[in-house]
Amino acid sequence: DSIKHHGPAYHTGIGRVVYGGGGITPDIFVAEDTLGMTSYYKEASMSGLILQYAFSYTDDNRLKLNNFKEMMEMSDYLNKQNLVEQFATYADKHGLQRRNLLIKKSHKLLERSLNGRIIYNMLNEQAWTEYINQDDPVIRHTLEVFHNNAAFPKKPAAVAKKPLTKKKKK
C-alpha cells in the first residue's frame, strides 16, 4: 500500500526530492485493489474463456443487443442478464472447474470483464474504454487531482534560513 525508497535521495532544480536506485516513483501513489483477484478469475482471463464466451454471447444475442446504442444503456441491460452464472456454466464445460466461492469473490471483476467485452463487440473500443474505466480508482484519483489543479508537483516550501552574521574579530 505504499512505496518504499531504497536508493539515495537527490534534489531537483526546484527542490523536489527524487530517489536513485532505478525505476520511477510516481508523484501520486494509488494502491491497487486486488480484493476480487482469484485464481479462478486469472485462469478465466488467461485461458481466453472470457473472450470466447463474450463473443459467443454477442453472436447469440446480436438482434437484442442491436437495440442498445449507448454504453450505459447496454451495461444496465447486461447487468440484469446474470452473465457471471452463465459464464461459470460455459467455463465449466470448457475445462475451467466451477469454484463457487472464488466465483463469488471475483463476481465484480468477472461481470466487468464479460460486460466490457460484449460492449466492445457491439459498440466500439471507445465505449469499452469508458465502461472499463468508469470506476477505476486511478482514473478517479487522476480526475480529482486535475480538478484541484494539483496535477503537477509544486516547488517545496523553502526552509527559512537564519540571516548570516559576520563574526567580529577579536
Descriptions of predicted regions:
Residues 1-170:
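Conserved functional hotspot residues or short segments at active or partner-binding sites
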